[in-house]
Amino acid sequence: MFPMVTEFMNYGQQTVRAARYIGQGFTITLSHANRLPVTIQYPYEKLITSERFRGRIHFEFDKCIACEVCVRVCPIDLPVVDWKLETDIRKKRLLNYSIDFGICIFCGNCVEYCPTNCLSMTEEYELSTYDRHELNYNQIALGRLPMSIIDDYTIRTILNLPETKT
């Protein structure tokens, strides 16, 4: 009998419900206003990477037995392993080992399946260059010890930031 009255009440309930939802969203927004910013000034400040971070691959030439397991488990067949069979001792002698980080997807399969643990992931992630051919690392470049971000005093990490008085 009074469809207009019920529609008006329904409209009023919808208005109240919409105002409540807007209020809930606004309170969430205001609760985040008290938090400190997460942004860092990248070249001058760096975050400390986690233990399981997959950065540049470190290679130990003396441990490698040239078994080519890393090549077989790599989804893109990336590591290039050159070896020569020594007939007198019946073992492979590693001549060259290289990885092109311009193609590498940093999946970590080579590190995980290496039987001699000659490969390991480091925390280095700054591999950018102006020439893509510089990203092809041979065994000498891969054997370079990783520089820890924490030990670098020219870079302010989150642990080394000066305390601010609030």
Curated annotation (Swiss-Prot):
The keyword Cytoplasm does not apply. Keywords: 4Fe-4S, Chloroplast, Iron, Iron-sulfur, Membrane, Metal-binding, NAD, NADP, Plastid, Plastoquinone, Quinone, Repeat, Thylakoid, Translocase. One of its GO terms (molecular function) is 4 iron, 4 sulfur cluster binding. It is a peripheral membrane protein. Its cofactor is [4Fe-4S] cluster. It is found in: Plastid, Chloroplast thylakoid membrane. [4Fe-4S] cluster 2 binds at residues 74, 104, 107, 110. NCBIfam families: ndhI (TIGR00403), NuoI (TIGR01971), PRK05888.1-3 (NF004537). Belongs to the complex I 23 kDa subunit family. This is NAD(P)H-quinone oxidoreductase subunit I, chloroplastic. It comes from Acanthospermum australe. The lineage of its organism: Eukaryota, Viridiplantae, Streptophyta, Embryophyta, Tracheophyta.
